[in-house]
């Protein structure tokens, strides 16, 4: 297990950086690397845990033998429930436990290094500005407070799915940034676009980045997160993200 091989964060900024790194690794495990993660969680093995590491990687491993452990431990035995649930529900369950673990690690560091009321509040606000892992992997990522109400309302009132266009138009829109609503003002369009969240890493939309939309789950992804370039996307008629591709294979 990881022990304390990484630098120990001591300031609010360092603890938040540690949090973001671990979070990115966990999101990767439950989205772009989900097939690899699924196969590593063999129910025939002993109690396994999913660890997110500060360097944005992840690992499935046995819990540490040290008692009490140096850091709070993630949920034990996630592999035992794998075959007794729908894959989607199992991934969601692991995501919820992973969110809880991230918070416990962050505030463990806060307690260890004597964070006061204001420091704890600032740390929580920084963490709370990011979507939870559960929100990212289930496609329910929340935007910032001033955008969430209008943005989520407009999405829930949509007609349930993208309109069907010609194949050439579909291919073009697939590589475009998250779509704007034509009947909204320019400012609202900008807010809606900025509020879009990558289904893999959970980060918000950036105007200078290439994005692609999954035709199955209709989530948007950074091209770099799903290893798709603009040139490659030109030749894809119907794109499916790693999670949807894996789900289809599991059901086959």
Swiss-Prot record:
The record marks 205, 211, 215, 220 as: Histone H3K4me3 binding. The modification Phosphoserine is found at residue 176. Residues 149-161 have a biased composition (Low complexity). Keywords: Chromatin regulator, Metal-binding, Nucleus, Phosphoprotein, Transcription, Transcription regulation, Zinc, Zinc-finger. GO terms for biological process: chromatin organization; regulation of DNA-templated transcription. Pfam families: Alfin, PHD. Residues 141-193 are annotated as: Disordered. Residues 184-193 have a biased composition (Acidic residues). A zinc finger (PHD-type) spans 195-247. Ubiquitously expressed. Changing residue 211 to M: Abolishes binding to H3K4me2/3. Coiled coil: none annotated. GO terms for molecular function: methylated histone binding; transcription cis-regulatory region binding; zinc ion binding. Gene3D superfamilies: Zinc/RING finger domain, C3HC4 (zinc finger). Its main location: nucleus. It is found in: Nucleus. GO terms for cellular component: nucleus. Interacts with H3K4me3 and to a lesser extent with H3K4me2. Belongs to the Alfin family. Histone-binding component that specifically recognizes H3 tails trimethylated on 'Lys-4' (H3K4me3), which mark transcription start sites of virtually all active genes. The PHD-type zinc finger mediates the binding to H3K4me3. This is PHD finger protein ALFIN-LIKE 7. It comes from Arabidopsis thaliana (Mouse-ear cress). The gene is AL7.
């Amino acid at each position: 297990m990881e022990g304390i091989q990484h630098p120990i964060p001591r300031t609010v900024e360092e603890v938040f950086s540690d949090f973001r790194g671990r979070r990115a690794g966990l999101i990767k495990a439950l989205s772009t690397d989900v097939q690899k993660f699924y196969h590593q969680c063999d129910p025939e093995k002993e109690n396994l845990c999913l660890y997110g590491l500060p360097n944005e990687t992840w690992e499935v491993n046995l819990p540490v033998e040290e008692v009490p452990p140096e850091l709070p431990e993630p949920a034990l035995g996630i592999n035992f429930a794998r075959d007794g649930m729908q894959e989607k529900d199992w991934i969601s369950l692991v995501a919820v436990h992973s969110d809880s673990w991230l918070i416990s690690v962050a505030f463990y560091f806060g307690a260890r290094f004597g964070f006061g009321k204001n420091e704890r509040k600032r740390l929580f606000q920084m963490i709370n500005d990011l979507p939870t892992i559960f929100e990212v992997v289930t496609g329910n990522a929340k935007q910032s407070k001033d955008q969430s109400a209008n943005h989520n309302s407009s999405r829930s009132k949509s007609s349930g799915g993208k309109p069907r266009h010609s194949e050439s138009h579909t291919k073009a829109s697939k590589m475009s940034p998250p779509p704007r609503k034509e009947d909204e003002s320019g400012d609202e369009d900008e807010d809606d676009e900025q509020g879009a969240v990558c289904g893999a890493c959970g980060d918000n939309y950036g105007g200078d980045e290439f994005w692609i939309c999954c035709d199955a789950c209709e989530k948007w992804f950074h091209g770099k997160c799903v290893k798709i370039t603009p040139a490659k996307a030109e030749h894809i008629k119907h794109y499916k993200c790693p999670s949807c591709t894996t789900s289809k294979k599991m059901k086959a």
